[in-house]
Amino acid sequence: MKTFKNKEELLKEWEINGACKDGVEFNKSCKDLQEILEKCPLKFRRWRLIKGYVQFAEHCPWEEMKGWEWVRLLLAQPQYEDKCYWGKLTGGDWADLLIEKQKYEVKCDWEKLSEADWDYLLYYRPQFK
């Protein structure tokens, strides 16, 4: 988990971490690290959290994340499960999550899974039959 002391450290990391051009430009447009952390748009913030940049969690608008965004984040960084708005996950989102992380079966809203979602899930994880 990478943390930064200042904007310059962050900019240096962003030269090598595969960040998109728009994300780099956003960083440069801010006056300091605190402004970056506070004002970072969700579309950049979720990528940064997935990559393990934990400082971006503090000002995250968790309630605005969509189900598929939660799946991607939880697969990469399960420590954020206590922030998750589980009701945002669709049946397809649940299938994607459960295929990779069966531990979330206790959280699953099974009624959201359609027949197609069940077929998909059971193909990869027949133990859920």
Please provide the spans of the model-predicted regions:
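Ankyrin repeat (ANK) tandem alpha-helical domains that serve as protein-protein interaction scaffolds
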Residues: 1-129
